[in-house]
Design a protein with these regions (language model features):
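Hydrophobic alpha-helical transmembrane segments
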Residues: 1-168
Length: 168
């Protein structure tokens, strides 16, 4: 019996659910606000508790995005390993590491929202710039394209994670 489709579906569901939790609940407010900061377009973050203000430039934006990706990838790794263990799927450690590397690196590339960043440039090249800039009627084009980017790469990550998978 070929269990690979079921293993893929399991890995994808776990990675996707973990990504939503990591992106929307685990990510800190400061990382969400500062991860796109550059020296040319700094972000001033005001702590909601202390009202202390911190200005983030390029290095601070990179650190904020990197920390977000660390927590994002750790969340995905924890959920993927725990979930597959509960479901009786044995993943190869190297495949899991590869999957998390794909997810984490591509997440950083998309989330480092510098002016004219990767997703904005891709939107321009594919004729989606107007959608990327959409921010009315309850829609946010940049966010929708960001999530589509993550879903696509998580599909590849799930395929990678299940390479050599078998039953426990």
């Amino acid at each position: 019996m070929n269990d690979r489709p079921a293993h893929f579906g399991t890995a994808y569901a776990l990675l996707r659910a973990a990504a939503d939790v990591a992106d929307h609940w685990v990510q800190s407010d400061v990382c969400a606000q500062a991860k796109g900061a550059t020296d040319a377009a700094p972000v001033v973050y005001e702590d909601p508790k202390t009202q202390a203000k911190t200005t983030f430039g390029t290095s601070g934006g990179r650190r904020a995005c990197a920390w977000h990706v660390v927590t994002y990838t750790a969340t995905q790794g924890l959920v993927l390993v725990a979930g597959t263990r509960v479901l009786g799927v044995r993943l190869h450690p190297a495949a899991v590491a590869g999957a998390l590397a794909i997810s984490g690196l591509t997440h950083y590339a998309a989330d480092r929202r510098v002016p004219n960043g990767l997703l904005h440039r891709l939107a321009k090249k594919t004729g989606k710039e107007r959608f990327y800039k959409l921010a009315n009627f309850g829609m946010n084009g940049a966010y929708a394209l960001d999530q589509a980017w993550h879903h696509g790469w998580e599909t590849l990550a799930a395929l990678t994670a299940t390479a050599g998978a078998n039953r426990r």
